[in-house]
Amino acid sequence: MPAILEIPLPLAETEITTTGQTFSGTNLLRTYIMKALSLRLFVLIAALSIALTQSARASNPVVDWNQIALTTALTTPGTQIYLTYVNLAMYDAVNAIDRRYQQYGPEFHGPRDASKEAAAISAAYQTLLYYFPAQTAALQAQYDSAIAGIPDDQAKASGIAIGQIAAARIVALRANDGRGASVPYTYPAAPEPGVWIATPPAFAPPAMPWVAQMVPFTMRSASQFLPVNGPPDLGSRQWAREYNEVKLLGAVNSTVRTPAQTEIALFWTANPVATYFGAFRQLAVDRHLSISKSARLLAMLSVAFTDAGIGCWNAKYHFSFWRPVTAIPNGDIDGNPETEADPTWLPLAPTPPHPEFPAAHGCATGAIAKTLENFFGTPDVKFTINSAATHTTHTYYTVGQLETEAYWARIYAGFHYRHSLNEGFRLGHRVAKQLNQDFFQPRHADDH
């Protein structure tokens, strides 16, 4: 993460694709080659590509049901929590059969010749059915279609039963975990120095304060990784530097933020759960991961994402620090002579409705980046992320590139100060480190 006050050029580190074109020399060469091919050869190659992609997806129900889970839960507050329930159920169901990794929930074993495909489908279906009974008809139709693709034999029957057990155990394990609880949170109606208030344009109430009190999946408590270094003192030079940085770079009418930096900021305003897990599913397909490894990857990433979110929300509602959209128009009340107020200042994009410190994208991205590095054993992981906000695609070649871009995106957007991002990434890294040490580990050295 950046340590000095400077504006990097993250675009030099990533490829950006828009309207189907990737701006790189490789893509240009590929375009000329494809134009030189005969139409018949092109059609054959395209058909083969589609067939291979469909085959890869059909053979990996873990990937398919991660998408189904996301679609099912997408409009429900705490989407990532439900996704984690489903991914853990699939992970435990598959591991009950092949026993390659530590199970997350209570240990149980099924026949080794049981169908892992049926187990994963059954586990995901039963978990979603429990949490989303109103969507029974749609889920039933998707389940019937998926399970029909598996031959009717004892292996299938055993797999279905194992999936049912895994789902029931995860549901029982997470009973009364605080999801959706009524947690009161009071905040001022008018600006006070350093204190969060509802922000324009919607002035929405604080989002999901109950997440701050949830029982985590791997942390000992929601506050285990509460940052020791809280927000900067309002009278400090550090506060003045960071205030003026986001004031300059994050303004809706900034004259110093480049078009490339604006695109980065807006790219990262898309729904982070949908954005990240779309990339993770494609990564599993691109790497040709087995069902077992796909289940482990998605379980690790979803737990890291969710626990980082729980720790982050706990810190947000503990410190309750003000956003730039509140601080900058009220710079004259913070007691710092170097923070000149601008009553007309607005950020590039609407500010999310929850306290500023620490940065949620820092917490989540830090946890995700380190978990990817731990899973693959290297920071050099190539993957692509699509943004529904900008309809552009960014390709990363290392997890460090992802972290750098996500870091600066929140400053360019006018959402966060530098210290908040530093502490957010630190929290996410700590979550990922503990997860990797204590959970989802191979039973044998050659099972990585």
Segments (PLM) and residue ranges:
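Short N-terminal alpha-helical targeting/association segments
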Residues: 6-9, 46, 412
